[in-house]
Amino acid sequence: KINLFFEKNNQIKNFLNFDENKNLMFFFENRLIKEHLSKLLKKTKIKVQKKTIRSIDLAENKVSTNLSSKSYDLVVLCLGSNSPIYRKVNGNREIKKNYKEHSITCSVKHQIKDIGAQQFFLKEGPLAILPYNKNKFSVVWSIEDRYFIKNTKNLSNYLKTKLSNLLKTNRISLGNIQSYPLKLSLKRNYYKKNTIILGDGLHVVHPLAG
């Protein structure tokens, strides 16, 4: 089941509740997915090289790295959301918007019994809890910049205090706390000749909170 908590009215509402004893969905840690994909790649003829891309030549389909330059039949760019290399493809034509918010993410170990997926609508912004297993869940909190800036230097304690108050327990342990600014970015052109942009380089949208 999924519960929604509204801080303004101090109300908890049940959003989804299935009684069939079947899994509604599954969540996987990104780290585990990468490890599994890495093992699968080692069993194939796909060659993975760790290099730093310096530039691309669209006319010759050539990619220049810190070690060499080589031409390819197809070039797929997945370089995150801010790489200047994308300008070669889309000419910096994109739709942008600054949400003036940050996303805070972390993993939490706990001893809470039967905790499910929950979303809390707080004054700072929506916070979502997504369980990995019975003793661990992930947190995604979309928080307004004014609250983020005020608590940047003490982010770990700020987040732990907020979670402890929401979950009515201090017996939680936070790990892998990360944060990044939220923005909208939609590329108008996503391919040119034999080069295509995919992933965050193509579009970045608001995560809401999970």
What do the PLM-derived regions correspond to, one by one?
Residues 2, 33-34, 38, 101, ...:
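A general structural signal for well-ordered alpha-helical segments in protein cores
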Residues 81-170, 175-177:
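Conserved FAD-binding catalytic core of PHBH/FMO-like flavoproteins
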Residues 4, 56, 129-131, 190:
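A structural signal for short hydrophobic beta-strand segments in well-ordered beta-sheet cores
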Residues 3-88, 97-101:
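Conserved N-terminal helical subregion
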Residues 19-22, 110-111, 144-147, 202-204:
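A short, flexible beta-alpha/helix-coil linker loop
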Residues 150-210:
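FAD/FMN-dependent oxidoreductases across multiple families
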Residues 65-67, 74, 131, 141, ...:
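Residue-level recognition of conserved beta-strand positions in structured domain cores
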